[in-house]
């Protein structure tokens, strides 16, 4: 299933419109946040977490289920992609779905925007945008 999603023509066309036709899918990840399990994704930058340079790539997030603030949708720090890479601390919280636990401290939540998506919708973001997600409270 993940291979089909990663090579979906609509997704590839959207990515191509941003970075050109030389596209490489370097990985896929599922973040499963079931109700009551307490999982979250700490605020981080994919450029720091993944470590690919130059930063001329994008990350695609495809919602498998409806995603909203109540069930812990992704939040992005608006405009943070215009800044340099931020310092990340190692935070090995067992509930953090990032396996390496990289965390940006003191992200001003009032500057973050929830990415509310319906199942099947997609968000593309720059590798230096600060993003994370809260707990699933449903």
Specify the residue positions occupied by each region the protein language model found.
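Double-stranded beta-helix
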Residues: 67-134
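Short, compositionally biased
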Residues: 136-138
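Glycine-rich, flexible loop/turn motifs
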Residues: 1, 37-39, 45-46, 60, ...
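Short, conserved clusters of charged catalytic residues that mark active-site
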Residues: 10, 59, 108
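Short, hydrophobic/aromatic alpha-helical segments in well-folded domains
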Residues: 14, 46, 60-63, 129-132
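Short, conserved beta-strand element in jelly-roll/cupin
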Residues: 18, 44, 51-69, 116-119, ...
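Short acidic/polar capping segments at secondary-structure boundaries
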Residues: 30-37, 47-48, 55-56, 64-69, ...
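Non-heme Fe(II)-dependent double-stranded beta-helix
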Residues: 1-52
């Amino acid at each position: 299933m993940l291979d089909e999603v990663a090579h979906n023509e609509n997704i590839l066309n959207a990515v191509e419109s941003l970075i050109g036709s030389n596209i490489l899918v370097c990985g896929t990840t599922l973040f499963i946040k079931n109700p009551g399990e307490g999982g979250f994704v700490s605020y981080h930058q994919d450029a720091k977490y993944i470590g690919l340079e130059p930063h001329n790539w994008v990350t695609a997030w495809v919602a498998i289920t409806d995603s909203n603030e109540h069930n812990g949708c992704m939040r992005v720090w608006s405009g943070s992609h215009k800044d340099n890479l931020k310092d990340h601390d190692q935070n090995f919280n067992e509930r953090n779905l990032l396996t390496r636990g990289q965390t940006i401290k003191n992200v001003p939540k009032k500057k973050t925007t929830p990415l509310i998506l319906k199942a099947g919708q997609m968000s593309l973001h720059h590798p230096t945008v600060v993003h994370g997600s809260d707990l699933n409270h449903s």
